[in-house]
Amino acid sequence: MLQLQNLRVTIDDQEIINIAQLDIRPGTRLGLVGESGSGKTMTAKAIAGLLPDETKVSGSVMFAGQNLLDLSDRELAKLRGRRIGFVFQDPARSLNPMMRIGKQVSEAIRLHTDLKGKAVTDKVIELLHQVQLPEPETLLRRYPHQLSGGQQQRVMIAAAIAADPDLLIADEPTTALDVTVQEEILRLLISLSEQRNMSLLFVSHDLGVVQFVCNQVAVIYGGNIVEAGDIDSIINRPQHRYTAALLAANPGMPKDDNFSAFIGRRLQTITGSVPAVGKFPSGCRFRNRCQHASDKCQSIPPVSTASPDHRYLCWHPAQGFS
């Protein structure tokens, strides 16, 4: 479906992203997870060709047998709407406040399908129904400000899946929503992926959310994929010290609604912060924050495997998590 090979993104000769390999198989849901500044959104936008003009992208982004980096802007725009859908973080900033909802969704349909006339309106209603919006016939005549944040995000998802894409990229789609609405949107994305056999690249800073949504995960730090593979294997047996630290800093969920077990509990924290662009240390980019770092970590670790579907880059693997 999608294969990244030696993907490198730079701005003013400063390296931001350097991903040796990342694969998304057909029908899978892969979570791209890391702290703010780790390169998650930049990677997602590099795949979709949405980076600003001043960035330079090299390597390969293979999708359906073609390298997206070789396409013209026009070719990429056509493929992006028809084969790849993109859902942004903040729907209020992505929707046109001066345009009715039906018009905005219908634009995606007209651009990327052969439907015309009443068939377009029927498709808009069908899509709004699929994303579980009530009274779609009435809602399509409303403006974005008349909708809640959760409803706005459902509209964005409807527009993104209008042409029945093979891959949907969701960039922290629940960031601006309250917890209850977040869960509804997450369940919707899972349902749409399963119903349409649509691959999902789900960008998040929260491993717990990724575990809920995805069956594959890639952990990114400093623009590098440091661990990737089956979600259960990585959650239960993290190897890279950064992955283990993320899990230790995640409160998780109480068992049997026993919230009293969480009272007074101290969460572990990760010392320091993600280095600024151009300030990455040599070798393992996490080594300046890692309690287990040694001189060996000044050189780039080789790719190691914990299982056939679990790869990592770490000189001192965690060998499990408890």
Predicted regions and their residues:
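Conserved ABC transporter NBD signature motif
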Residues: K56-N67
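Conserved ABC ATPase "signature" region
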Residues: N67, A119-T138, L247-A248
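ABC ATPase NBD coupling module
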Residues: L68-G85, L111, S233-P238, P275-P281
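Conserved ABC ATPase signature
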Residues: R142-L147, Q151
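A short, proline-enriched helix->beta-strand linker immediately N-terminal to the Walker B motif
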Residues: A162-D166
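P-loop NTP-binding/switch modules centered on Walker-like glycine-rich loops
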Residues: P173, L177, V181-F259
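Charged, flexible cofactor/metal-binding loops and thiol motifs
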Residues: D230-S322
